Amino acid sequence: MQTLLCQPCKSLPILTASSSSSLIRSSGDVRECIDFRASEKVSKFQFHVTLSPFAFRGFSICREFAVRGAYGIRFCSREDVSGVGNGGIVAEEEIELLNKPNPLPKSENEESGKADDDAILEPFLKFFKPEEEGEGIESEVSDETDRVSVEYYDPKPGDFVVGVVVSGNENKLDVNIGADMLGTMLTKEILPLYDKELDYLLCDLKYDAEEFLVNGKMGIVKDDDEGVEIAEFARQGRPVVEIGTVVFAEVLGRTLSGRPLLSSRRYFRRIAWHRVRQIKQLNEPIEVKITEWNTGGLLTRIEGLRAFIPKQELVKKVNTFTELKENVGRRFLVQITRLNEDKNDLILSEKVAWEKLYLREGTLLEGTVVKILPYGAQVKLGDSSRSGLLHISNITRRRIGSVSDVLQVDESVKVLVVKSLFPDKISLSIADLESEPGLFISDREKVFTEAEEMAKKYREKMPLVATSPISDRPPITSSFPQGKDEEIYANWEWFKFESQ
C-alpha cells in the first residue's frame, strides 16, 4: 500500500459533511480506493490511496462516483471531466496540479476590452482586407475627392512650366507650379550658365562697356551695389534667388517622395538649341571668344552651349600646340557648319565665316605675292592660309609681255575680289582699281591710295542680288514648342498674373 499526500486547491471544493466517505471504482485489474475525511473548518486533507500491483504509472480518478452528502465533488481525469451532485452533473472548476499555473477563465470585462482594441485597430485593418472588401473604401475616397473642388496640375516629364519660388536654401528651391505638391529645383539646375562662362558674359559698365556692348551680344551686367556673388549666397545658407521670383523650368520627373523635379537649366538649354538653329538658318558669321583648347582645335560657347572649332577650320594655319594655345581669350568670327542636339554636337568654322565676309565680290584685300606663274600670280590673302589667282589679264588694263615684269615674289599688293568662273576658286584683280588704264605700271602707289574709292564704285556697279525674305524661308525644325504662352506652358491656366 502506498500513501499519497495531496494539498487542497481551489478546484477541489471542501465538503461540509462531517462523516467520512469512500470512493471505489473497479476497472479491470485496477482497484482504487480513496478514503477522505473532511470537516467545515478543515483546510488540509489527507487522502489514502490503495493501488493494486497492476496500477498504471499515473493514477486516474474515476469519471463518475457517488458521494454521500448533499454536496457534489468533481475530479479531473486525463481523459475528461464529469461530476455528480444532487442527481445531476455540476459544473465546477477543474482540479489543478500543485504549484502550477492555472488558466484564468475569461470574463465579460476582458471580452469588452478586446472589442475596444478592435475598434482602435479598425482604421488600420482596412489595408489588410481582400480587394472585395476594399472596394467600399476606394469608393469612399473617390467620394471625398469629388467633394473637393480644387483642381491641381498634373506634371509630366518634358512639360514646360511656370512657377513661383516660395522657399529654399543653398541646396534647392521649393517652387509652386500648381501641382498637389511643391516642386523641387536643385541649385545647380537654377542658373543656365557655367562658372567659366561668367567671366566672358560679365560686363562691368565702368570699364569695358564700349567693348562689351555690341549688337546681338548677350551678357550680364555687374552690380557692385549688391556686393554679394552667387557663391556668397550659398555660403550664407540663402537661396540664390529671392522668394517670389517667377521661374521657367522643365519637368524632369518626380522624386521618391512624389514631388515634381524641375530644371531651369534644361529649359534654357532647349531654348539655346532653338536659337542656334536660327543662327544657322540666317547663314551669317557670329563673334565668339575662345575659352579652351585641345589637341584637335579650339573650344568656345554659343548661347551657353559648348562648340568646337577644328584646327583645320582655322584661317591661320597652326603648326604647334603653343600657337594653338595662344588663341585662348581671342575673339573669332565663325559660322555654324554642323549641329546635332541629340549628340550635343556643335561644329564651327572660321574659314567659312572668313570667306563669307572677305571673299565676296567687291571686297578689297591686302595680299602678298607668293608665286609667279606664266598666266598670272598666286597671292596669299592677309594672314590667312587662303590664296587667290591674279590672272595676267587682271593685273592692268594695258598689255604686258610677262608677269615677272610688273610683279615680284613677296611683294605686297592690294587686290579686289571679283567674280570667278570657277566657284571653288578665288579670283583677284588690280586692273579694276585703276582710275585710268595702265596706272599700275606708271604709278602703283596712286593705285593703292585710291583703292578704297575705286572698290566702292565697283560695288555700286554690281547688280543687286535678290535675297529671299526671312518669312519665305523654311521653318526651323526644332523640338522647342512654338506658339502662345498658354500653348507652350502646360500649367499656364493655373498661373495667372494680376496687376496691382
Swiss-Prot record:
It is found in: Plastid, Chloroplast. Disruption phenotype: Pigment defective seeds. Virescent/yellow leaves leading to pale-green seedlings, due to reduced photosynthetic function and disruption of associated signaling networks, later associated with impaired photoautotrophy. Abnormal chloroplast development with disrupted granum-stroma thylakoid membranes and disrupted photosynthetic electron flow. Reduced accumulation of rbcL mRNA and less production of Rubisco large subunit (LSU). The keyword Plastid applies. Present in leaves (at protein level). Confined to leaf chlorenchyma cells. RNA-binding protein that acts as an RNA chaperone to remodel RNA structure and activates their translation. Required for seed pigmentation. Necessary for chloroplast development and subsequent photosynthetic electron flow, as well as for non-photochemical quenching (NPQ). Rubisco regulatory factor which regulates the concerted biogenesis of NDH, PSI (including PsaA, PsaB, PsaD, PsaF, PsaL, PsaG, PsaK and NdhH) and Cytb(6)f (including PetA, PetB, PetC and PetD) complexes. Binds specifically to and involved in the post-transcriptional regulation of plastid-encoded mRNAs (e.g. Belongs to the bacterial ribosomal protein bS1 family. This is Protein PIGMENT DEFECTIVE 338, chloroplastic. It comes from Arabidopsis thaliana (Mouse-ear cress).
